[in-house]
Amino acid sequence: METITSRDNAKIKYACAVRDTEKQRAADGVFFAEGPKLCLELAKSCTPRVVYATAAALVKTPELARFDPAEIAPHVAEKLSGTKSNQGVFALFETPVPPADILNTARRILALEGVQDPGNVGTLLRSAAAFGFDAVVL
């Protein structure tokens, strides 16, 4: 496996575009995730299109090997993260498409719009699960 060492690599630029622009995410049906825990958890229900990881992250999280990750240099990880302190794992996942009839068959639906704080979304999702909601629309 060859390590991606250029911050100007086309694949890295594309991942940054997905991370930064809703238009890119919507057009390609993908979303960006960062961090080993989040990426492994998302992989249980979403299809990873590509996974990027530093050598250190691959040693720390050997479970990532099943996704055939592209190895990236630490300075490339900084570009993907936008920070110097990151966990070195990034992925693009296919956006799941809910069944077309979900709004007709679900009995309890939580609809969220314009929630500013991601922590509030997490709280609302956990509450919806605890109260037996069938669907959440973001």
Mark where each language-model region is:
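Glycine/small-residue-rich loop that forms an oxyanion/phosphate-binding "nest" at active or ligand-binding sites
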Residues: 61, 65-97
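Boundary-proximal intrinsically disordered activation/regulatory segments immediately upstream
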Residues: 1-59, 138
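Short secondary-structure boundary segments
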Residues: 55, 95, 114
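Residue-level signal for inorganic ion chemistry
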Residues: 35, 91, 128
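A general structural signal for well-ordered alpha-helical segments in protein cores
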Residues: 12-15, 39, 73, 77, ...
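Structural motif
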Residues: 32, 52, 90-92, 109-111, ...
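Phosphate- and divalent-cation-binding pockets in alpha/beta enzyme and binding domains
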Residues: 41-42, 60, 79, 120
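RNA substrate-binding interface of SAM-dependent RNA methyltransferases
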Residues: 44, 102-138
